[in-house]
Amino acid sequence: MGKRDRLSGNEAVAIALRQINPDVFPAFPITPSTEIPQYFASFVANGQVDTEFIPVESEHSSMSAAIGASAAGARALTATSSCGMAYMWEELYIAASNRLPLALALVNRALSGPININCDHSDSMGARDSGWIQMYAENNQEAYDNMVQAFCISEHRDVRLPIMICQDGFITSHAVENIELLEDAEVKGFVGEYEPENYLLNPECPMAVGPYSVTDFYMEAKRNQAEGMKHVEKVVLDVAKEFAEMSGREYGLFEAYKLEDADRAVVMIGSAAGTTKDAIDKLRAQGEKVGLLKIRLYRPFPAEAIAEALKNVKAVAVMDRAEGYTNHGGPLGSDVMAAMFRARSTALATNIIYGLGGRDVRVEDMEQVFADLQTMIDNDDAGETYRYMGIRE
């Protein structure tokens, strides 16, 4: 039986990591993820974990050390945000290309510049094509639950790829909520012991990691990565089913909130989904058929399942907390619209950029989004398909 506690998102993730008891945790602090290694360091000092905690001199080094540990056969992870992630950019691709199932606790923060320490998704969206699995949390409970499930997904023999567990900086990382924790023994049994398939410290099977790859081999290596990513959706669902049996909390590739009979829908990632649910409840009480599709698994992108979930809506607003600089749409908008196009959807669609640099998202803002969708339906015209919400003109 689990217990209820009042925790910030960062502390919840740190507790999940204590329960997992990884082998190696290299870390370098950066706001707003600093508290994760800070809390974890206290667990190390108090003898609550056996983890080799390595304070390093930079984020590039923290990911490099995690890669080295994982290549040697250890269960490894690190944590970072924003410019710290940018500093380890080169290493993100190294981890993925070497099929190392390490984890990154990413607390989403705007990339500079101008310099900003608040939330948006520009850091993780910039790395969306690096070969990492990406999962996002709406609230502190989901941040904890996703972290518990992370290694079960990344270490699966059909996957063997690194995973990012993302939550919104300050909005969830520092805000305190009541959440339900699992018992330590439950998490330990659920995650299990790491059994590396190929690793450097195996005298029975000598191998090289990350050798120079010439034209004859590079493309096959990339195809191999892509094949591993194709298995992720099924593994995520299988792990979620096992997690639900243990915890009673159900997860999928996304959450469809009051979407069954909706004629207007919002698609989004992260904490603003909670605000959107409040707006939906208010509008539903007034008889309006509105709903939400909240993305949990963003990479790989579950295009077919998302298109199927949206097949009956008349108008969709895809909300991006990151600018794409394409004159076409943000990252999520481009992916969702492509999925709808392939499914031959006739729904009107628009892409809305919102919340950059931590700008607040209010219930009234989301009510206006649904009102704009109704206008699109009434006029049978999507109008401006690349918009901004809450911006001063």
Residue ranges with predicted function:
Residues 162-255:
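Conformationally flexible catalytic loops at phosphate/diphosphate-handling active centers
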Residues 41-46, 278-292, 341-342:
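Short helix-loop-beta junction
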Residues 36-39, 65-67, 88-92, 113-119, ...:
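Short acidic, glycine/serine/threonine-rich loops at helix termini
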Residues 8-13, 241-264, 277:
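Glycine-/acidic-rich phosphate or pyrophosphate-binding loops and their flanking alpha/beta elements
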Residues 1-126, 131-132, 148, 390-392:
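Thiamine diphosphate
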Residues 118-162, 166-169, 345-359:
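Conserved thiamine diphosphate
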Residues 260-288, 301-308:
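Redox- and metal-dependent alpha/beta enzyme cores, enriched for Fe-S-associated oxidoreductases
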Residues 320-393:
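Peripheral docking tails and interdomain loops at the edges
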